[in-house]
Amino acid sequence: MMEKSLNTVTSLPLRVIYCIDRASAIRCLAKSQHAVPIQVLKEVEPKKVICQVDIQHVIQTVCRCSPELSCKSQGDFSVYFLDHTEPDELFVGLGYWSSLLLSPTLNAGTSNSDTVWVNGFIVEFGIQRSIEIKLRFQSLQNSFEVGTPETHTSSKFLSSTLPPSLIFDPSSSEKSDSISGSLFDTNYTCPVNINGLSKQKSVRELKSPSRPSALAETNVEELELDSLFHASNDISCSATSFSEPYILDHQAALDHPATDPVCSASSTTVNSAVSTKKRRRESSTISPESAYVAAQLQNPSEREQVHEFIKEQVRIARGRIEKKFTNVRGKNRIEEQLTLSLQEGKIPPYCQNCGTIKTANWRNATYMNITLMLCNACGIYWTSRRSMRPRNLWSTYKAFETEKPLENDAFAQLELAVYKLSQQRKLSISIFRELENAGRHSPLNRLTSLDSTHSAPDPNHISKPSVVNQQKSRGGPRTAKLKNDLRRIQSSPIVAPTPDTSFREPLSEIGSNDSWLVLPNSLSANIQNDVLRKTDFMCTDKENVAFPLKTTTKPMPKVNKEETEPTLPVCDSEKENDDLECYFRTPPKPTTLQKQQQSPSPWRSELFLSDPDQNVLTPRHKPKFDLSKALSSVAKSNNIENSPQLPERYDFSLELGLNSQLDNEERRDIPLMTDLVMPSSPPMVPADRHLSVENTC
C-alpha cells in the first residue's frame, strides 16, 4: 500500500456520523452548512485521503443538528472519535461532552497547542466531496461536576456564545448545600444517592431476598407518578453538571425552625413529616427501575408515557403468571423472532441444510458426533430416512434460485442473504462432505444403487432392480412378491460366505424401508450342489426338495384318484440297499391332481427324529393295510382299546419295521383304513400287533 504525505490546507463540508450508547444500533448524521478548513495528512490509496479538522467545528455541527445533546436534562456523555491514523482504527476518548462544550476552542484567538483535532476520510457523493468524522456518545448515569481551573476560566467565554439555559450556575449547588445542611440539624439522615435510589432502601432490599417481585404485586390503581417523583427527588442530594439540584422539600426548607415564628410546633412537624416519608418508602413496592426512570423524567408527557408503560408491564406480568396469555404461534411468532434477532444485531437461526429461517419447530440431528440445527422438514426427513433432504424439495431453492424476491420485502431479502450464507458455510462443515461422499444427500433409491456397485457382476443382480422398478412404475400390488422373497430368506440354509458368493442387497430393492433385512442373490451352481449334499436333518423343507430318482427302485404302483390318502411308512428288512437318501423321500403325488397348500407339520417333514448313528429306514413304496379283518367283534365294541391312539402301556409297543413275527407278504396285502391315520398324525402301530400282545398277556 502506497502512502504519500500532503501538508495542504483546504475547505470541505463536514459530515459527522455519531451514535448514542454502545448498545444502540441507530446512527445519526449531522451536516455542516458551510465548508470548514481541513488539513490533509496523508493519502493511503488513490481515493482514500485522511484529513483532520478542529473539534470546534464538529461540536457546532452536532449541537445545531441535535439540540437535545446540549439540553441539561439529558445528562452528560463521554465522547469518542474513530482515529484512522491508528493501525487498528481505534476509538480515542475525548473526555466529557460538557467539558468539550465549555472548552475555549469554541472561541477565536486560541493557540494551536490547545486545539483538539479529529480525523476522517474524504468521501465523494456524486460531484460533492466532504470529510466524514465518526463519533460515539456514551451516556453517564451519575456525572458529578469536577471543579477544574479550565471550567471556571471558560465560563466567561461561554456566556457570550451560548444561551443562558446551557450555562451552569455554581450558586445553585451552594444553595442546595445550605439547605441540606439546615435539614441535618433536625436529626434527619439524608441517604446517599446511588443510581437515583436510596442507599438505605437498596440495603433493605438486599437483606430481604425472599421479597416477591415488585411488578407482580404492584397495584396499578395505587401507582401515583407524583408520589414517585416526590419520593425519588426527596432522596437526591447531588446534582449533575447540567441540572439544578432538586430541593428535598421546598415547604420543609421554608418552615425551618430558625426562620419559622412558631418554633415549638415546627420541629414536631418536620419530625412527623420525616417519619411519614420513611414509612411511605418502606411500605412502597415500586421497582428500582421504575423509580429511576420516573426520577429522570420531568416532562409531564413523558410521565404519562412511563405510566402507561408500567401499566402494560404489570398487566403482561400478571397475565403470564396466571397463564391467561397463550404462546404466540405460527407466522406471528416467526416474525417476532426475526424482529428480535434484527434488534439484537444477530443472525437469525437458520437451517444448516436448506437455509430457511421460517419453520414451525427446530430439530437437532446428530451424526458423527456433530450436531446440526435443521428445520422441521429437514429434521423429519433425516429421522425417517437418515439422509439429508434433497435440494429439489427446498422451499428456499424454489423461491430464490428460480425467481428473485421483491425488493420491498424486508423478510424475503433477509432470508435470501441467510440462504446464501448457509450454502457457503456448508462447504466448511465436515458432516456434509461425508454425507455427500456416502450419497446421503439424495433419496434411498440412489443409496441402493451405490450399494449395488460393490457386488459382483451378475446378470440376475442387474435384472432384479429393473423388475421391481417396472412394478413400481405400473403401480401394481407387490404383496405376493414380498411374501415370497421373505419366505425364501427364512427358508434358505445358512451358508458360510466364500469368495465366489455375491454380496447381499438391501431390502430397498423390493420397496421396503427396513434396511436391516437383506435379500440373497441368485445362488451359483456350487452353492446348490453344497445344499444338495447336506444331510436330511439340516433341511427344513423336504417336501419341495427335488432329489433325483434312482433307476434301481421299483416302479410306483398305479393307484386310483379316490385312493390318495396318506400311507403308513414301513421298511423292508430283507432288502439291502446302501443308498439311504431314497428312504427319506416322500413319494411324489399324481400329476393329475392339483397340489393343495397344506399347513406345515413336523410329522410331514420329519417322520422320525433319531440320532445320526441309528438307522431308521423308510421305504419309498408304502403299501396300505386293512385292519378290518384283524379286529374282532369284541374288540370293536371296546372303543378305548381300539382307538387310533397309542396304548398307555408303552412297554409292549414294538418298533415299526423291526418285528420279525409278521410276514412281509401279508403286510402288503392288508389295506389300511383311512379312519385310523390322519394326514397330520404321527405314525401308528398296527392294531393287530396290539391285540396280539394283549391276548398273550
Swiss-Prot record:
Region (Disordered): 443-484
Chief location bin: nucleus
InterPro entries registered for this protein in UniProt: Spt21/Ams2 (IPR042403), Znf_GATA (IPR000679), Znf_NHR/GATA (IPR013088)
GO terms, molecular function: centromeric DNA binding; DNA-binding transcription activator activity, RNA polymerase II-specific; RNA polymerase II cis-regulatory region sequence-specific DNA binding; zinc ion binding
Disulphide-bridged cysteine pairs: none
GO BP term, pick one: CENP-A containing chromatin assembly
Zinc finger regions, GATA-type: 351-378
Database matches in SUPFAM superfamilies: Glucocorticoid receptor-like (DNA-binding domain)
Compartments where located: Nucleus; Chromosome, Centromere
Alphabetized UniProt keyword annotations: Centromere, Chromosome, DNA-binding, Metal-binding, Nucleus, Transcription, Transcription regulation, Zinc, Zinc-finger
One Pfam family per UniProt: GATA
GO CC entries: chromatin; chromosome, centromeric core domain; nucleus
Highest taxon listed in the record's lineage: Eukaryota
Comp. bias intervals (Polar residues): 445-455
Complex and partners: Interacts with CENP-A.
Function: Required for proper chromosome segregation via regulation of CENP-A localization to the centromere.
Protein name, entry field: CENP-A multicopy suppressor protein 2
Organism per entry: Schizosaccharomyces pombe (strain 972 / ATCC 24843)
This protein's encoding gene: ams2
